[in-house]
Design a protein with these regions (language model features):
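Secreted, cysteine-rich disulfide-bonded mini-domains of extracellular proteins
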Residues: 8-50
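Generic detector of ordered, mature protein regions
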Residues: 21, 32, 38, 67-69, ...
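N-terminal regions of proteins, emphasizing targeting and processing segments when present
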Residues: 6, 55, 156-160
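Sec-dependent bacterial lipoprotein signal peptides
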Residues: 1-7
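Predominantly extracellular/luminal regions of secreted and cell-surface proteins
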Residues: 44-75
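Generic structural signal for beta-strand residues in well-ordered domains
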Residues: 12, 24, 31, 58-59, ...
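Acidic, Ser/Thr/Pro-rich low-complexity intrinsically disordered segments
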Residues: 74-193
Length: 193
């Protein structure tokens, strides 16, 4: 009786896996920073962002003012941008109307690829120092596709002024080699729950 024993290894086709945290890919593949997928090294591209970095929005007081203004109960405002290595952060300013008839909350969802440095969400209220506010989302995103989401729901005062910032987390950034990311911020005001 002859017993044949052989080792097998799975063949992983390029483009079948999204890049993991810190650009992690299966052996023999590398992260294509254009598509956020694992591919053969010869086809991997460098990180690109089609949205130019806005200058002067690097702190709460200088954030881009959202126009038109948000209502007491507003539709979702979606903002897409990138956080570059040399960019301290992107800030967006908005006000809560002073005439809301019920308590209002800020709802924000930040979505970004897991392959690069996680983006942190900070909130400054009425000119105070910003604080990190993001946490796990109560409702998971339906199509994650190599991305993750962080959320915030916070009750705020009528007539208050806010700046929401998307900043470097300082973690899982490949020792600085992937200290960048693309993101989508979905922001709205709603009746507090």
């Amino acid at each position: 009786l002859v017993l044949l024993v052989g080792a097998c290894s799975a063949d992983i086709a390029p483009g079948t896996y999204f890049c993991g945290p810190e650009q992690l890919c299966p052996e023999g593949l590398t992260c294509d920073a254009v598509e956020d997928i694992c591919t053969v090294p010869s086809q991997a591209g460098a990180f690109e962002c089609e949205i130019p970095d806005r200058t002067g929005d690097d702190e709460p007081a200088a954030g881009l003012l959202l126009q038109p203004a948000l209502d007491c109960v507003s539709g979702v405002r979606e903002l897409k941008a990138c956080l570059f290595v040399d960019d301290p952060g992107d800030w967006f300013q908005f006000s809560v109307p002073g005439n809301c008839t019920s308590a209002v909350q800020i709802e924000a969802r930040l979505t970004y690829p897991v392959a690069y440095e996680p983006v942190a969400m900070q909130l400054s209220t009425d000119g105070a120092a910003p604080v990190v506010v993001d946490g796990e989302c109560r409702v998971a995103a339906t199509d994650t596709g190599g991305q993750t989401s962080r959320c915030v729901e916070v009750v705020v005062e009528n007539g208050s002024q806010h700046a929401i910032g998307l900043v470097h987390s300082g973690a899982l950034n490949c020792g600085g080699d992937c200290a960048f990311n693309r993101y989508t911020l979905s922001l709205q005001l709603s009746t507090a729950q």
